[in-house]
């Protein structure tokens, strides 16, 4: 499972090291060499678990964006991990406490609002 592209529909077999990866970032994390780019790719569909090959060239049409076995659309916009927005700082919170150990705002509020 890819931690970079959350909706990866296929796994890609690399030509350089023959490993199955979900994205280029995954390859860069596990390999000590750059990714070898080729025009032909071997893929495994994550829906039907069957392997197939595609040729990336100038004549690709819309039908080449689907798995030939189950018609799963694998050329889609990637959904990547989005950072959680930080909560706004309450005017009641003492700003000097924000620098203490870089704590989350929720943790600071829990500590400062305790009674007794």
Curated annotation (Swiss-Prot):
Pfam families associated with the record: zf-CHY
Name this protein carries in UniProt: Uncharacterized protein C3B9.05
Record-listed Zn(2+) 1 binding positions: 2, 4, 23, 26
Gene Ontology terms describing biological process: protein import into mitochondrial intermembrane space
Positions of Zn(2+) 3 binding: 45, 48, 67, 70
InterPro entries: Mito_Tim_assembly_helper (IPR052604), Znf_CHY (IPR008913), Znf_CHY_sf (IPR037274)
Swiss-Prot/TrEMBL keywords: Cytoplasm, Metal-binding, Zinc, Zinc-finger
């Amino acid at each position: 499972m890819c931690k970079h592209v959350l909706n990866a529909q296929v796994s890609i077999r690399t030509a350089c090291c023959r490993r199955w990866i979900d994205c280029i970032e995954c390859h860069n994390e596990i390999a000590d060499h750059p990714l070898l780019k080729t025009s032909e790719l071997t893929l495994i569909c994550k829906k039907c678990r069957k392997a197939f090959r595609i040729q990336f060239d100038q004549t690709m049409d819309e039908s080449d964006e689907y798995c030939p076995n189950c018609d799963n659309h694998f050329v889609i916009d990637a959904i990547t991990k989005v950072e959680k927005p930080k909560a706004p700082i309450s005017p009641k919170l003492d700003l000097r406490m924000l620098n203490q150990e870089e704590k989350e705002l929720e943790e600071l509020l829990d500590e400062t609002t305790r009674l007794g």
